[in-house]
Curated annotation (Swiss-Prot):
The gene is dapB. It comes from Cyanothece sp. (strain PCC 7425 / ATCC 29141). This is 4-hydroxy-tetrahydrodipicolinate reductase. NAD(+) binds at G13, A14, A15, G16, K17, M18, G108, T109, T110. Belongs to the DapB family. It catalyses: (S)-2,3,4,5-tetrahydrodipicolinate + NAD(+) + H2O = (2S,4S)-4-hydroxy-2,3,4,5-tetrahydrodipicolinate + NADH + H(+); (S)-2,3,4,5-tetrahydrodipicolinate + NADP(+) + H2O = (2S,4S)-4-hydroxy-2,3,4,5-tetrahydrodipicolinate + NADPH + H(+). NCBIfam families: dapB. GO terms for molecular function: 4-hydroxy-tetrahydrodipicolinate reductase; NAD binding; NADP binding; oxidoreductase activity, acting on CH or CH2 groups, NAD or NADP as acceptor. InterPro entries: DapB_C, DapB_N, DapB_N_CS, DHDPR_bac, NAD(P)-bd_dom_sf.
Length: 275
């Protein structure tokens, strides 16, 4: 099932929008091999995942049981990597299970709480097992966040707007929360009040993140993934925006994460940490 010397990869959530792109990218990478594909879609069980994603047969059946694949992977000379693009309700258990079987997780599913991330870090440390948790695999988004950090030196007012397709289950997005966290870690408080505000509808001013940063979430069909970071000062507005037009833009980051996680022994959060 594996190519000699290649990193075995299990794609969890393989029939989803992101999972399909990961399957294609892994199948085309010479130093990776698709060890297994997992998805709970009952209509696709047993089908060749290559046929499901439209690239021809890969001789890898789509299965529903993640644990059985992790058991099989643990018996390989190199246990490899599990890439998880599933659901906020299942990702925590998926990651713990992978670590327990010696398979390194690369996590693209958002929705993990800070407490869950800390618990996974403790679990991974005890196992000396690498794990990457990455809210956004886009190089462009990393550049936007770096530009926002630089801009925050000169602006005291900032708000974040994130826009996603209406199938996204969590809000705010992990990327927006990460952006707010990066700005909050700079040691300043944003958006000093100019007036006493009254919300006539609950949530009209968005959700309040750390250090006074507000995040607004939009969910509509037709969107993929978009984020604006808007800075304001008297007489000027500075807007940073990143737009995703195709999910293939995430694949260079996913492939980099698969390769990098093999040399880690703890949890690392954010693509910028491995660039």
């Amino acid at each position: 099932m594996t190519n000699q010397g290649a990193i075995p990869v299990i794609v969890n959530g393989a029939a989803g929008k992101m999972g399909r792109e990961v399957v294609k990218a892994v199948a085309q990478a010479a130093d990776l091999t698709l060890f297994g594909a997992v998805d709970r879609n009952p209509s696709l069980q047993g089908q060749d995942i290559g046929e499901v994603v439209g690239i021809g047969p890969l001789e890898v059946p789509l299965l529903a049981d993640l644990q059985s694949l992790l058991v099989a992977a643990a018996q390989e000379p190199q246990a490899g990597v599990m890439v998880d693009f599933t659901h906020p309700n299942s990702v925590y258990d998926n990651v713990r299970m992978a670590i327990a079987y010696g398979v390194r997780p690369v996590v693209g599913t958002t929705g993990l709480s800070p407490e869950q991330i800390r618990d996974l870090a403790t679990f991974a440390d005890k196992a000396s097992m690498g794990c990457l948790i990455i809210p956004n695999f886009s190089i462009g988004m990393v550049l936007l966040q770096q530009a926002a950090i630089q801009a925050s030196q000169y602006f005291d007012h900032v708000e974040i707007i994130e826009l996603h397709h209406n199938q996204k289950a969590d809000a705010p997005s992990g990327t927006a929360l990460q952006t707010a966290q990066l700005l909050a870690e700079l040691g300043k408080t944003y958006n000093p009040p100019a007036v006493k505000e009254t919300e006539h509808l609950a949530g009209a001013r968005g959700s309040l993140a750390e250090e006074g940063i507000r995040i607004h979430s939009v969910r509509l069909p037709g969107l993929i993934a978009h984020q604006e970071v808007i800075f304001g000062a008297p007489g000027q507005v500075y807007t940073l925006r990143h737009d995703t037009s195709d999910r293939s833009c995430y694949m260079p980051g996913v492939l980099l994460a698969i390769r990098k996680v093999m040399n880690l022994e703890t949890v690392v959060y954010g693509l910028e940490k491995i660039l």
